[in-house]
Amino acid sequence: MNNHQAPETETLAETDNFMAWRANEPDGETTYYLQLGRATINFFMEEWDELLASIAELKQAKANEEGMFAVSFDNVDVWMDNEDWAEFLQLLRDLEK
């Protein structure tokens, strides 16, 4: 008999290529996920709160000399071109609502 319970999930924001969602795990913990294209980054609640607190700063980011934007999550750096960055910012704006 399989007693495995699937987490309850809720989409928090979504664009054409990016998505943010929350999972309420069977053990009572809440985790958050940020899917950026093919990459999915998971966050514990405290880390998610840090991301939300940094939205204003992320909106002010400038591209480097190659026209690329970078965002760092714990041990992961994600580089985006102008089009992807604009979509990422839209996702962040939707999360602020």
Model-identified regions with their sequence ranges:
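Positively charged, low-complexity terminal tracts
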Residues: M1-K97
